[in-house]
Amino acid sequence: MEGEELIYHNIINEILVGYIKYYINDISEHELSPYQQQIKKILTYYDECLNKQVTITFSLTSAQEIKTQFTGVVTELFKDLINWGRICGFIVFSAKMAKYCKDANNHLESTVITTAYNFMKHNLLPWMISHGGQEEFLAFSLHSDIYSVIFNIKYFLSKFCNHMFFRSCVQLLRNCNLI
């Protein structure tokens, strides 16, 4: 890798891969860079809000299923707009899917990381760079308020449920007056 490609690789590793590896316990908190420790705070908050709303379960037994389901959900999430809040939801969703694979001992967490990395590189990175890159993402993570987090979590859940056709998930969202 050279020049611009290396810069992009480093951005994705700082924002996405580091958090996923931390989330699935492949690295400890003290192994995170100072930047990663800062964004971990907002991502952990997104994760906590998401966990309060619904339990996301997966049925993944092959690399192809992971790629298909993952790409379907995140394509739906970003089909009409990219913003930092949705990117946070994307990262947390990626981490949850990787953790599921690791906990299921199916050794497919690397497929999730690779699929998420490629999606971010090809679909999100140009937007991220044109909107301030790592610095703006950090600013967003430091200054997000509870309402923007909840709004983005509700939006993510509605897209997740729409794509995955989880009737029980949709019903839960309705019962909680979230959609």
UniProtKB/Swiss-Prot annotation:
GO terms for cellular component: host cell endoplasmic reticulum; host cell mitochondrion. A motif (BH2) lies at residues 126-141. GO terms for biological process: regulation of apoptotic process; symbiont-mediated suppression of host apoptosis. InterPro entries: Bcl-2-like_sf (IPR036834), Bcl-2_BH1-3 (IPR046371), Bcl-2_fam (IPR026298), Bcl2-like (IPR002475), Bcl2_BH1_motif_CS (IPR020717), Bcl2_BH2_motif_CS (IPR020726). A motif (BH1) lies at residues 76-95. It holds the Pfam family Bcl-2. It comes from the Viruses. It is found in: Host mitochondrion; Host endoplasmic reticulum. Induction: Expressed in the early phase of the viral replicative cycle. Expressed in the late phase of the viral replicative cycle. Keywords: Early protein, Host endoplasmic reticulum, Host mitochondrion, Host-virus interaction, Inhibition of host apoptosis by viral BCL2-like protein, Late protein, Modulation of host cell apoptosis by virus. One of its GO terms (molecular function) is BH domain binding. Transmembrane segments: none annotated. Belongs to the Bcl-2 family. Suppresses apoptosis in host cell to promote the viral replication. Has the ability to potentially bind to all the members of the proapoptotic Bcl-2 family. Inhibits autophagy by interacting with host Beclin 1 (BECN1). Interacts with host BECN1 (via BH3 homology domain); this interaction allows the virus to inhibit BECN1, and thus autophagy. Interacts with host BID. Interacts with host BAX. This is Apoptosis regulator Bcl-2 homolog.
